[in-house]
């Protein structure tokens, strides 16, 4: 199922690029766009995780005695997973994400703010949540979706510019390109929403079962949501990568359109589902 989603995303990216190439440069533009899309697909599959980590200035954590490393190692062994690479993000806004392409090539990144704010039980809940994403192969889809959304934003900007000068180009259709420039960002949001919402519920449940302590994750989610709603955002946060985090970095921004295309379930709903899981785990 996850492989099918990956193929769909990469294929859709290729189609978008080819369409843009044809609209802008006819047959020659289409061929050039196809080659560019193939290169981007290769890059997205093998290197998109490193691009995201680099974007957030993530630093490899090799200190085996550090609480984040120690907890990750303990939970990884319990989940019967290979040890992922562990990164610290030098930012005091509490948040975390997982990235990579499979169990063998995976990484967990947490901000310094997360480590400073949460107690050990809460930290276990967050890290278990990210390991659940790794276990269920959500990480490849999420990371590719981030690169894909960024590419769509770039294409939309190019189309807006092309639409302005399109009357001077024989093969361009400025009206079509302007329409696409409007629709493409919406398509990116829908893809991010589809990728993320249901997977967050599954990762929450997986974390609760792995730790045996839903309360730890509940408490962590509440703290992270309250902090996000205070208006603080992680440095370099982008809408294209927002779906990767355990809490959307932009959840503090009030927007009707933003609520419609929300990448995460509401934190209240997530906490309520974890509450329901408590009684099941007590049995």
UniProtKB/Swiss-Prot annotation:
Q: Which domain of life is it from?
A: Bacteria
Residues crossing the lipid bilayer are 6-26, 27-47, 139-159, 175-195
**Membrane topology label:** Multi-pass membrane protein
Q: Which organism is it from?
A: Aliarcobacter butzleri (strain RM4018)
Q: Where does Zn(2+) bind?
A: 129, 133, 200
The entry's family comment says:
Belongs to the peptidase M48B family.
- Main localization of the protein? membrane
- Residues forming the catalytic site: 130
- Name the record gives this protein: Protease HtpX homolog
**Record's subcellular location:** Cell inner membrane
Q: What is its EC number?
A: 3.4.24.-
Question: GO cellular-component terms in the record?
Answer: plasma membrane
Question: Which keywords belong to this entry?
Answer: Cell inner membrane, Cell membrane, Hydrolase, Membrane, Metal-binding, Metalloprotease, Protease, Transmembrane, Transmembrane helix, Zinc
Q: Name one GO biological process term.
A: proteolysis
Q: How is the cofactor bound?
A: Binds 1 zinc ion per subunit.
One Pfam family cited in the UniProt record for this chain: Peptidase_M48
Record InterPro entries = HtpX_protease, Pept_M48_protease_HtpX, Peptidase_M48
- Coiled-coil annotation: which residues? none
Metal-binding keyword on record: yes
Gene (UniProt)? htpX
Key word NADP present:
no
MF GO annotations: metalloendopeptidase activity; zinc ion binding
Q: Identify the cofactor(s).
A: Zn(2+)
């Amino acid at each position: 199922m996850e492989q099918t989603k990956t193929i769909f995303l990469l294929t859709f990216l290729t189609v978008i690029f080819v369409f843009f190439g044809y609209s802008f440069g006819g047959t020659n533009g289409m061929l050039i766009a196809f080659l560019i899309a193939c290169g981007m697909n290769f890059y997205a599959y093998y290197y998109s995780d490193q691009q995201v980590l680099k974007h957030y200035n993530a630093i490899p954590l090799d200190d085996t005695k550090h609480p984040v490393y120690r907890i990750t190692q303990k939970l990884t062994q319990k989940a019967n997973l290979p040890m992922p690479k562990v990164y610290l993000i030098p930012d005091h806004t509490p948040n975390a994400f997982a990235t990579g392409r499979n169990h063998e090539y995976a990484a967990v990144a947490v901000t310094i703010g997360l480590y400073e704010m949460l107690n050990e039980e809460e930290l276990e809940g967050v890290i278990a949540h990210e390991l659940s994403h790794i276990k269920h192969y959500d990480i490849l889809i999420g990371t590719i979706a981030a690169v894909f959304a960024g590419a769509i934003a770039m294409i939309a900007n190019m189309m807006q510019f092309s639409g302005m000068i399109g009357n001077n180009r024989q093969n361009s259709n400025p009206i079509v390109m302007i329409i696409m420039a409007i629709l493409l960002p919406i398509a990116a949001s829908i893809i991010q929403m589809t990728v993320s919402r249901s997977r967050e519920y599954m990762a929450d449940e997986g974390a609760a079962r792995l730790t045996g302590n839903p309360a730890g994750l509940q408490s962590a989610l509440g703290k992270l949501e309250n902090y996000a709603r205070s208006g603080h955002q992680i440095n370099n946060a982008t809408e294209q990568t927002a779906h990767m985090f355990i809490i959307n970095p932009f959840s503090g921004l009030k927007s009707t359109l933003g609520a419609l295309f929300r990448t995460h379930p509401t934190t209240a709903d997530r906490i309520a589902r974890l509450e329901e899981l408590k009684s099941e785990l007590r049995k």
